[in-house]
UniProtKB/Swiss-Prot annotation:
It comes from Rattus norvegicus (Rat). Residues 1-27 are annotated as: Disordered. ISGylated. Residues 58-331 form the Dynamin-type G domain. It comes from the Eukaryota. The C-terminal GTPase effector domain (GED) is involved in oligomerization and viral target recognition. This is Interferon-induced GTP-binding protein Mx1. It is a peripheral membrane protein. The gene is Mx1. Homooligomer. Oligomerizes into multimeric filamentous or ring-like structures by virtue of its stalk domain. Oligomerization is critical for GTPase activity, protein stability, and recognition of viral target structures. Interacts with TRPC1, TRPC3, TRPC4, TRPC5, TRPC6 and TRPC7. Interacts with HSPA5. Interacts with TUBB/TUBB5. Interacts with DDX39A and DDX39B. Residues 358-622 are annotated as: Stalk.
Length: 652
């Protein structure tokens, strides 16, 4: 709940006699506001309505930011534009960003003001109380002294004599820490200013005293860094009465854009000084005094004639600039609103439909969630899941594993046949264990032992592949659960538990089948026709190879080499058939147990959850952050929907 207090009027300000000059000045201001209303009011109404909707939470809206070096007179410029006395003095005066929202009332309506910061909202009944309330707010936010804060203070002013406008007063740039300020005060202030002036929707008013070298001004340098072309930067020279005699022509050159070029150029104003305030010079009188100053000044008179001097001319210029800037920003603003709307809609869609209040509908809702989950699992099993361009389907990953397995088998048997160790073993058998068989005959027992040993060596790699594939499938199923049940902590947790239990059982069953298959592979067997064909092809290839190598020359191979060659041919023939069998059968076992049966068991397990209707509410308990996120997205969509309607109405 916001704290609401009322700043009472303490005493009545001293009234000055109503002179004809003051009346003319006030009439000038009223005419200015009238022009402003005719030209800008429709645009400002649109932006204000968007701001009232809270669209600034989603994107930036057109505004005017006033920046300047410390004590450059920027607060005085805001004061002159708004008709409200703001904190002023030496050192850092603006210690928090001040959002000044001006609202024009009809003639005769009463002035009112409001200061809003954090959870505090203070009604102000008279302009003379504004400065005190701003100082109080700054002390509460940034603390007593000269520290700064990035927390906003909002000052709303409603008056017949102000235009509809939003201005932002930012802390003045300082270079040396004083008092209780942190050593990095300059960096903090610059970072705070940059957050505002870098937005393309912000017009930057760079305030520079007339009696300093503009080329060395830090404020102008910062503005040029974020706006190199000067498309949204206006230079404002202040304190022309403090210019040293003889340097007036240099000031004129600056205002005429001849020194430090800005696309939007410069203007010059003379606001109330400290002595004027002490003498209680009113803002209307200050405008008249400013007019007389420029009109009678021998060098600056020409700037008044060019429309580049005085606060009324500045206000008129800002009217045109802001109107143009808003119109220029509207297409971009409309596009940003549409993009943000689409993003929010897509994000909200991921959270799914709202949970029904009725119990029977809630059960139907849960059933639908589980059915969608089961369909997604089935799509994974059937290699029909929807994926992005950068992703790969689950079965594609498994197929790559199976292809790598087949390559591994071929490489394994190839190394076996070509290994010097195996040739040494066969030669040792020929030398030490050969029986009655004639040269060239293969000892079947030796042949069988070699086959068993090499096939056995493939068992652990097969199990390793099983574990890799199981992990892939488990992760894919878990991702489906997360996509479908991610907002429902209990349902997602239950699904993950089911996935883990079924994974364990199916992996265990697949491991038993793989080990059983390798036990069967220890029985050396092959269909006669297949084995004969493979052996014949191997012998023909080797004969062709020998023929091309030695030509017609027939050589007599030693007895040992003959037996070894024969054994190698038989091993090669058997490996071809055995390798095909293992290369096909192990992937089939894994697909059946880890993909197909796993998916079927998951479907059964999830449907069984519907049997216990008492747990329906428990399963559909949403995570608190999900609920808040959905509420946030719905509020954003409502804002953006209304913003789209207002923009469409404005365009029409």
């Amino acid at each position: 709940m916001k704290e609401r207090t009322s700043a009472c009027r303490h005493g009545t300000p001293q009234k000055h006699p109503d002179t004809s000059e003051e009346s003319q000045a006030m009439e000038s201001v009223d005419n200015l506001c009238s022009q402003y209303e005719e030209k800008v009011r429709p645009c400002i109404d649109l932006i204000d309505s968007l701001r009232a909707l809270g669209v600034e939470q989603d994107l930036a809206l057109p505004a005017i930011a006033v920046i300047g070096d410390q004590s450059s007179g920027k607060s005085s410029v805001l004061e002159a534009l708004s008709g409200v006395a703001l904190p002023r003095g030496s050192g850092i005066v603006t210690r928090c960003p001040l959002v000044l929202k001006l609202k024009q009332l009809k003639q005769g309506e009463k002035w009112s003001g409001k200061v809003i910061y954090k959870d505090t909202e203070i009604e102000i009944s008279h302009p003379s109380l504004v400065e005190r309330e701003i100082n109080k707010a700054q002390n509460l936010i940034a603390g007593e002294g000269l520290k700064i804060s990035s927390d906003l203070i909002s000052l709303e002013v409603s008056s017949p004599h102000v235009p509809d406008l939003t201005l932002i007063d930012l802390p003045g740039i300082t270079r040396v820490a004083v008092g209780d300020q942190p050593a990095d005060i300059e960096h903090k202030i610059k970072r705070l200013i940059t957050e505002y002036i870098q937005k393309q929707e912000t017009i930057n008013l760079v305030v520079v005293p007339s009696n300093v070298d503009i080329a060395t001004t830090e404020a102008l340098k910062m503005a040029q860094e974020v706006d190199p072309q000067g498309d949204r930067t206006i230079g404002i020279l202040t304190k022309p009465d403090l210019v040293d005699r003889g340097t007036e022509d240099k000031v004129v050159d600056v205002v005429r854009n001849l020194v430090c070029h800005l696309k939007k150029g410069y203007m010059i104003v003379k606001c109330r000084g400290q002595q004027d305030i002490q003498e209680q010079l009113s803002l209307a009188e200050a405008l008249q005094k400013e007019q007389v100053f420029f009109k009678e000044h021998p060098q600056f008179r020409v700037l008044l004639e060019d429309g580049k001097a005085t606060v009324p001319c500045l206000a008129k210029r800002l009217t045109m600039e802001l109107t143009s800037h808003i119109c220029k920003s509207l297409p971009i603003l409309e596009n940003q609103i549409n993009v943000n709307h689409q993003i929010a809609s897509e994000e909200l869609q991921k959270y799914g439909a709202d949970i029904p209040e009725d119990d029977s509908k809630r059960l139907s809702f849960l059933m639908n969630k589980i059915n969608v989950f089961n369909k997604d699992i089935l799509s994974l099993v059937q290699a029909q899941e929807n994926i992005s361009w950068e992703e790969s389907r689950l079965f594609t990953k498994l197929r790559n594993e199976f292809l790598a397995w087949n390559d591994y088998i071929e490489e394994h048997f190839k190394k076996t046949l070509g290994s010097s160790e195996k040739h040494s073993q066969m030669e040792k058998f020929e030398s030490h264990y050969r029986g009655r068989e004639l040269p060239g005959f293969v000892d079947y027992k030796a042949f069988e032992n070699i086959i068993k040993k090499e096939v056995k060596a493939l068992e652990e790699p097969a199990l390793n592949m099983l574990h890799r594939v199981t992990t892939m499938v488990k992760n894919a199923f878990t991702k489906v659960s997360s996509n479908n049940f991610g907002d429902f902590l209990n349902l997602h947790s239950t699904a993950k538990s089911k996935i883990e239990d079924i994974r364990f059982n199916q992996e265990k069953e697949a491991e038993k089948l793989i080990r059983l298959h390798f036990q069967m592979e220890h029985i050396v067997y092959c269909q006669d026709q297949a084995y004969k064909k493979a052996l014949q092809e191997i012998r023909e290839k080797e004969a062709e190879k020998e023929k091309s190598t030695f030509g017609a020359f027939q050589h007599n191979s030693p007895r040992k080499e003959l037996t070894t060659t024969e054994m190698t041919q038989h091993l090669n023939a058997y490996y071809q058939e055995c390798g095909r069998n293992i290369g096909r059968q192990i992937p089939l076992i894994i697909q059946y147990s880890i993909l197909q049966t796993f998916g079927q068991e998951m479907e059964k397990a999830m449907l069984q959850l519907l049997q216990d209707t008492s747990k329906c509410n428990w399963f559909l308990t949403e995570q608190s952050d999900s609920r808040e996120k959905k509420k946030f997205l719905k509020r954003r969509l409502l804002r953006l929907d209304e913003a789209q309607r207002k923009l469409a109405k404005f365009s029409n």
